[in-house]
Structure formats: structure tokens, C-alpha cells
A protein has these predicted regions:
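Extreme N-terminal starter segment of soluble prokaryotic enzymes
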Residues: 4-8
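N-terminal strand-loop element at the rim of the active site
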Residues: 10-18, 22-73
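Short amphipathic alpha-helical segments
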Residues: 52-53, 99-104
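Short glycine-rich, flexible loops that bind phosphorylated cofactors or substrates
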Residues: 69, 97-99
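Short hydrophobic/charged patches on amphipathic alpha-helices used for structural packing
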Residues: 75-79, 99
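Glycine-rich phosphate-binding loop signature in dinucleotide/nucleotide-binding domains
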Residues: 81-88
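Short His-centered aromatic/hydrophobic patch
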Residues: 91-97, 114
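A short helix->loop->beta-strand "cap" motif at the edges of active sites that frequently abuts
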Residues: 105-110
């Protein structure tokens, strides 16, 4: 019997590759692909997009995302993504907007790291 993979969405608002971005790339390179189905939500113009795709990890690139404390447009777009993707976990990297959108979309587990 095949075990269902846990769906995890990581959300980064950074356009450059900083500390969180480097950590995420390391994680994506070595995570267990048999147990975890991982996707990453990024601003469409982030330098991270190509780096994540090079690791054969799906990217959901958003035009609406800004790197600020609360972003109404991004909130609506993220909630829509979370409802469509139905992740088991949303892991945000310092984004209050993503945490609030995940809660609105009733994501079971929401983690945040800075």
C-alpha cells in the first residue's frame, strides 16, 4: 500500500536569496521526496524562482506578493492558493500575510520561522 505524501507549502516573500532562502534551498535539496510533496510560493520576480526550479521543486509564482507586514492583495491570492492546493502544512518565513491567509483557508498546521 502506498502511503500518502504530506503536502507542504513554503512561502517566502524575499526577492533576493538571503538566510531563509539559503536554508530553504538546502532543505529542498535534501528533503525526503517519498514522504513529502513540497511546493514553494514566491514573488514572480524573486531570484529564488530559478534556484528552486533547478531542484525540480514546483514553484507557485505570485505577482501580487510584496515583502511587507500585511498585503491585502497577497492575502486574497494566498488564501485562494491554499484552498486549491489543500496543504497539510504551510511554512512561512516571516510573512504575517501568509500566516493569516493559511488560517483563513483552514490549513491544519501553520509554521513560521524568521
Amino acid at each position: 500500500m502506498t502511503e500518502k505524501r504530506m503536502k507542504i507549502l513554503h512561502v517566502l516573500t524575499d526577492r533576493n536569496i538571503g538566510g531563509a532562502g539559503r536554508w530553504l534551498l538546502y532543505y529542498l535539496k535534501y528533503h525526503n521526496r517519498e514522504k513529502f510533496a513540497v511546493k514553494v510560493v514566491l514573488p514572480h520576480d524573486s531570484l529564488q524562482v530559478a534556484a528552486v526550479q533547478a531542484l525540480d521543486v514546483p514553484v507557485l509564482a505570485m505577482e501580487e506578493m510584496e515583502d511587507k507586514s500585511f498585503d491585502r492583495k497577497a492575502f486574497k491570492a494566498l488564501a485562494k492558493i491554499f484552498r486549491a492546493e489543500r496543504p497539510d502544512i504551510v511554512h512561512t518565513h516571516a510573512s504575517m500575510t501568509a500566516r493569516m491567509a493559511a488560517r483563513r483557508a483552514r490549513v491544519p498546521y501553520i509554521f513560521n520561522t524568521k
